[in-house]
Amino acid sequence: MNKELISEIPLLEDKAVSEIENAASLKDLEKVRLSYLGRKGVVKAYFDDLKNIDDAGEKRDLGAVINVLRNKIDQLITSKENELKDKEVKLKLQNEAVDITLPVRPERIGKIHPLSKVISEVKLIFAHMGFKAVDGPDIEDEFHVFDALNTPSHHPAREEQDTFYLRNKINDKRMVLRTHTSSVQIRTMEKTKTFPIKIVAAGRVYRNDFDATHTPMFHQIEGLYVNENVNMGQLKFTIHCFLSKFFGDKGLRIRFRNSFFPFTEPSAEVDISYKDSKWIEVLGCGMVHPNVFKNVGIDHTKYSGFAFGIGIERLAMLKYQISDLRSFYDNRVSWLNHYGFHFSSLR
């Protein structure tokens, strides 16, 4: 019996090698593996036959021969398995290959909203003039929105028909949705006593109004410059430089009209004649009122300053010829595709 086992092993090895080489798929190879190395396979049967050998030395030697056979078959199967897997991957890649000569489908890319574009551009222009961008809260107390800005309690702007008041008070203070970004200049002057103070603040503001030229929420950018000997001439120069740069017209016609704002004295409204159109108001400005300086603890006899407030929507409507303010917030993709900008234009 032992001699028969030894004589069968080379024949079995040749047969196993042939079947492994001829396996055309991983499924076929698995059948070969089970027939030789499985629990009911030929090699397992050989190991079981060792139990019938009494001589320990003979059993050991024959077991070593069978073990060599098992390891060789296992190595051949592993090698063949890797070969078949590589072949499957190559075949899959070949069948799934992309024809690079086919025309590509156009990729849809989102666009920058005109308001985002204008805010970015305005900030950049003022940054080149030395203004630092700052932020402030949308929900404010009455002091920062009205009282500190020299707006008396009987002023029409403080009535509920014009201003959104919140029901809950904070620290016993009546809260509002800010009606202008001027509240940011108050907060800046309260905490900053090093001069010069030169800031711009862009953000959302809220007023109870809705028509073709007004929305309950819109955007402003506030500017403030405080130092010794600041004068109206510097204000006019700053506004002129900004508007000329923004509209890309060094010869832009600009005029200042006397006006009134509680927080500036003197005050002015600025009009432009853009693309040979009639005069159009674009912003309000003026010299910071002495009472405003008193309310934030700045010596108005030593320091002076100017401030201005610009409607972002108004600038965008003029520059890009948008007729209805409400269209900024309609969320129409067709409108944004027409008036929007490529992301690379946002700086």
From Swiss-Prot:
Keywords: Aminoacyl-tRNA synthetase, ATP-binding, Cytoplasm, Ligase, Magnesium, Metal-binding, Nucleotide-binding, Protein biosynthesis. Pfam families: Phe_tRNA-synt_N, tRNA-synt_2d. The keyword S-adenosyl-L-methionine does not apply. Binds 2 magnesium ions per tetramer. The keyword Aminoacyl-tRNA synthetase applies. It is an enzyme of class 6 (ligase). Gene3D superfamilies: Bira Bifunctional Protein, Domain 2. GO terms for cellular component: cytoplasm. It is found in: Cytoplasm. Mg(2+) binds at residue 265. One of its GO terms (molecular function) is tRNA binding. One of its GO terms (biological process) is phenylalanyl-tRNA aminoacylation. Its cofactor is Mg(2+). SUPFAM superfamilies: Class II aaRS and biotin synthetases, tRNA-binding arm. Its main location: cytoplasm. It comes from the Bacteria. Its EC number is 6.1.1.20. It catalyses: tRNA(Phe) + L-phenylalanine + ATP = L-phenylalanyl-tRNA(Phe) + AMP + diphosphate + H(+). Belongs to the class-II aminoacyl-tRNA synthetase family. Phe-tRNA synthetase alpha subunit type 1 subfamily. Tetramer of two alpha and two beta subunits. This is Phenylalanine--tRNA ligase alpha subunit. It comes from Wolbachia pipientis subsp. Culex pipiens (strain wPip).
